[in-house]
Amino acid sequence: MIMHFTMNTLRTHMLRPWTILTLTVCLLTGPLFAAPMTEEDREHLLVHFEMTTLMVAEQVRGLSPAQLEYKVSPDRWSIREVVSHLAVAEPDYWRDLQKALKPTPDMKEKKSSATDADILWYGIDRVVHTKTGGGHEKVDTYKNLGEALGKFEALRATMIEYIKTTNDDMRAHSFGDREVIDCWQWMLEISTHAERHIQQIREIKNDPNFPRK
């Protein structure tokens, strides 16, 4: 489940520290409102979505069935289950975004509960763990990695095309009820949510008992 984080609580396929630092600095200097989306905001979203889309595919490429089904402990997800979760969750997140963009723009009367940098940090920080809910914990929806990855990549293609072409004023529309952010930030959070699970896949692969083949 995606959580909105405060500070308290690239066009590339490699997650390098300088990439995150550069993107964070750029986001901090971005505008609060844009009508429609600025090219700077568009590029930041595009870079992050392309990065995480490629990284998911890279992390699972060439893994054996034993590796895909390996669990660090019985109560933790396997790599196949992580990808299945993304394939189940992202369609809901995408629909939520489209719904939030329909009402009259309202961010001039509201204040975001998080900065862009907070949302970027959410993708990196694996110290704070959140419990998945809303049906997104149904990680056995896709028993086959290829099917789950195909669903994930197909929707990612749709979202990336939207980022490239939309004229929606995403900064002007709020998202959420209790902890409000703007719709541009929610779109970014869809990608940083995937980034968290990429980190999770890496943790599984780095476990001492992870199958060698």
Question: Residue ranges of each PLM-predicted region?
Answer:
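Bacterial N-terminal signal peptides that target proteins for export
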Residues: 5-21
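Bacterial N-terminal signal peptides
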Residues: 18-31
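Short, helix-capping/interhelical loops that line the mouth of catalytic, cofactor-
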Residues: 30-44, 95-152, 207-213
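Second-shell loop/turn segments in exported
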Residues: 39-46, 67-73, 78-84, 138-149, ...
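N-terminal targeting signals for Sec/Tat export/insertion, comprising classic cleavable signal peptides
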Residues: 42-70, 195
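Charged, amphipathic alpha-helical oligomerization/scaffolding segments
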Residues: 48-51, 55, 92, 151-154, ...
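Short, contiguous alpha-helical
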Residues: 69-119, 161, 165-213
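A charged, solvent-exposed segment within the mature domains of Sec-exported extracytoplasmic proteins
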Residues: 126, 130-190
